Amino acid sequence: MPTGPGAEAFRAAIRRGLTIKGIIDPVARANWETGMMVVGDRESDFNNTAVNGEDRNAREGNHSAGTLQFTRTTFEAYHEPGTSADRSDNVAQVCAFVNYAMNHYGVSADGSDLAAKIQQADPTRPAKGY
């Protein structure tokens, strides 16, 4: 499990975001936390100010940003009302990630199939964008 200031700040944000989303079961919380920690590590090394200015999305004016590297359009589409509209806000990214994972990829509310449905969240498989 990753450690360090960025990882610990993101882990705390995951826990706050899961509470906002109403995910209170300890097993479900562990499923989501484990997967999102893998994604945060792979996408940005837990850097909430990371910006990708290099890929196709960036060339099209829709760069990805934040710990989980959401494009502006995806973040806005899956934004959780009541959370910050700033993509550098980790709690807002966590809530948007849960919404995106469940609605776009069909991940169950308990997160038990998160790693199976989003390869980037699976520590046993190679990194792959989502």
Predicted regions located by residue number:
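Catalytic cores of secreted/periplasmic lytic hydrolases that degrade extracellular macromolecules
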Residues: 9, 13, 17, 24, ...
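Second-shell loop/turn segments in exported
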Residues: 1-4, 22-26, 61, 80-88
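Export/targeting segments at the very N-terminus of extracytoplasmic proteins
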Residues: 1-46
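Short, functionally critical alpha-helical segments immediately adjacent to catalytic or ligand/cofactor-binding
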Residues: 27-54, 94-101, 115-118
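A short alpha-helix capping/helix-coil boundary motif
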Residues: 14-16, 49-52, 76
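Catalytic and binding regions of secreted/periplasmic enzymes and modules that target cell-wall glycans
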Residues: 65-68, 72-130
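Short amphipathic helix-turn modules centered on a small-residue break
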Residues: 49-60, 66
